[in-house]
């Protein structure tokens, strides 16, 4: 994986941890961009002996929702997936004034085998923007890879950090 982004960093971390701790590891890439295709790869990993599955990206929320109770012996680490993201999957429309559960007998929950990890991308973005201006760059722009919440938070932080440094230095 060489996308120089979240996927690559996650994969490199999994490899490093597994190698340092004598663990086996494998990479499974969904064939497409649907929950069904992500779940199929999760199930393939489990059938091949995976005990811990690391999933990078908010798009895995529904996959966690679908797999967490079905595979209680497997640990799921969902990066950039909040508990609210997973719990929202229990509803037909989580944003409705009175959300209706898909299954009235299944209340929203995060199973003990799930760890949701979210980052404060805006803080890293702030530091990047601040450092750019402090290093003398005063004509800046920000282009994120995709218009997704994590990238938007980073971009917002970048702008705020650049503005703060420019204010300190009296630079426009």
Question: Which sequence ranges carry the predicted segments?
Answer:
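A residue-level marker of the well-folded mature domains of exported/periplasmic proteins
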Residues: 1-172
């Amino acid at each position: 994986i060489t996308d120089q982004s979240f996927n690559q960093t996650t994969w490199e971390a999994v490899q490093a941890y597994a190698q340092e701790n004598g663990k086996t590891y494998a990479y499974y890439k969904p064939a497409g961009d649907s929950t069904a295709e992500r779940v199929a790869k999760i199930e393939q990993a489990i059938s091949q002996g995976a005990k811990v599955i690391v999933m990078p990206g908010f798009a895995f929320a529904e996959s966690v929702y679908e797999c967490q109770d079905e595979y209680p012996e497997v640990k799921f680490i969902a990066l950039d997936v909040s508990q609210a993201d997973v719990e929202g999957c229990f509803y037909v429309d989580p944003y409705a004034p009175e959300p209706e559960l898909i299954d009235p007998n299944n209340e929203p929950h995060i199973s003990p085998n799930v760890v949701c990890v979210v980052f404060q991308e805006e803080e890293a973005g702030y530091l990047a923007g601040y450092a750019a201006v402090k290093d003398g760059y005063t004509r800046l722009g920000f282009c994120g890879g995709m218009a997704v919440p994590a990238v938007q938070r980073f971009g917002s932080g970048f702008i705020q950090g650049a503005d703060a440094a420019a204010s300190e230095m009296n630079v426009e």
